């Protein structure tokens, strides 16, 4: 069965609520449980409208037949933090290991690059090895750990804080240009460098103590 990835629409609100109840019951890695997000279709419609009207926010759904089996969103920030966005993702347990998470994350990163987002932030349970491995594969870096980030059945759960710096390619380009400039200078000064080296070797040879003849 083909998986279809597309942006959220207001008419998806009821399906989204069903999906959050499903995934909430399947894992403790989310901020909600089997109750789902607890909103009505009307509230979710307004939520989707707000996302779709924000040029720096997006929500993607992965569809299998007529059901949502994956969800990811980029939430743009405002004013002096408008270069940043928060990221969240979930996938139905039946689809774990099928690559849906990678496709959704790739879509969100592409959206961020196309819409002027330079930094993507996320948080994830520190023991969620599967998710952390996925994020690292796409270049996310751990920048800290927050203790007692969530509390489930009386147990405190730590979270890793991670980010993806989309400026990295431009930084690497600048580093490469600087390296090329240094190489050009080195080539221009090669004759002088070789001369100095020969002079140093000659001086060392001149002052070298010769073994006495028997």
Where do the language-model regions lie?
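Conserved GNAT acetyl-CoA-binding A-motif
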Residues: 112-123
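Active-site acidic-Proline motif in GNAT/NAT acetyltransferases
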Residues: 89-94, 98, 126-127
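Conserved acetyl-CoA-binding loop-helix of GNAT-fold acetyltransferases
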Residues: 97-110, 114, 133-137
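Acetyl-CoA-dependent GNAT
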Residues: 24, 36-93, 105-106, 165-167
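A short beta-loop-alpha structural element at the N-terminal edge
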Residues: 4-18
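Helix-loop element at the rim of GNAT/NAT acetyltransferase active sites that forms part
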Residues: 18-35
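Conserved catalytic-core motifs of GNAT/GCN5-like acyltransferases
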Residues: 121-124, 136, 141-157
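Short linear interaction segments
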Residues: 174-214
